[in-house]
Amino acid sequence: MQCFSFIKTMMILFNLLIFLCGAALLAVGIWVSIDGASFLKIFGPLSSSAMQFVNVGYFLIAAGVVVFALGFLGCYGAKTESKCALVTFFFILLLIFIAEVAAAVVALVYTTMAEHFLTLLVVPAIKKDYGSQEDFTQVWNTTMKGLKCCGFTNYTDFEDSPYFKENSAFPPFCCNDNVTNTANETCTKQKAHDQKVEGCFNQLLYDIRTNAVTVGGVAAGIGGLELAAMIVSMYLYCNLQ
C-alpha cells in the first residue's frame, strides 16, 4: 500500500510539472499569435526570421494543448484514481512514443531521399530570395555562421541569386578565411571553389553524428521517461479497486 501511495504521489508531481510546461507553451503561443510585435521586440531579428517559415504561435499552441492535456490526464487520473483518465493517458503517450520511433527510423533510412526533396525546395528559394528578402537572408546568414557552412549544398546554390547579381561574389561564409568577416578580399567563384566549404545539410548531419552520444542520450532519456510514465500509469490502473 505504501508503494502504491508513493508511486501515485510521484505520478501526480511529474504530471503537474508536465501540466505547467504545457500551460507555459500555450500562453507563449497565444502571446505570439495575438501580439507578435512585442514578441519580436524581446527576442530580436532571429525570431522574426524563424516566423518567416513556421508560424511559431500556432505551433506552440498545438504543442501546448497536447502537453497540457497529457499532464492534466496523468495528474487527474492519479489523484482521483480514474481508470478512464489513466488508460487515456497511457494510449496518448503510446501514440507519441510510436510517432517518435517512426520519425527516427524514417530519418535514418531516408536521409538521402530527404536531402533530394529538400534540395528541390530550398535551392530554388535561395536563388530567388537570398539578398532580396531580408528575413530569408538573415536566417541563412545565422545558419551559415553557426554551422560554418555555405548554402544548402555548396556555394553554387547562390549563383543567379539577387546577392550574387548585386555583388558579383558569394556570401563571405563560402570562403573559410571570410567566415569571421575579417578578410578584405571578396569571395569569388574561384576562391569559393578552392575553399570547398561544406553545405549546411551535410554539415548538420556531420554535427549530429559527431555528437551522436549526446543526441542519443537525450533521445534515450525522453524515451525512458515516456516508458516509465506508461508503466506507472498501467501499474496504477491495474492496482485500482
From Swiss-Prot:
Pfam families: Tetraspanin (PF00335). The chain crosses the membrane at residues 12-32, 53-73, 89-109, 212-232. It is found in: Cell membrane; Lysosome membrane. GO terms for cellular component: cell junction; cytoplasm; extracellular exosome; intracellular membrane-bounded organelle; lysosomal membrane; membrane; nucleoplasm; perinuclear region of cytoplasm. PROSITE patterns: TM4_1. It comes from the Eukaryota. Glycans are attached at residues 141, 154, 178, 184. It is a multi-pass membrane protein. Belongs to the tetraspanin (TM4SF) family. This is Tetraspanin-1. It comes from Homo sapiens (Human). The lineage of its organism: Eukaryota, Metazoa, Chordata, Craniata, Vertebrata. The gene is TSPAN1.
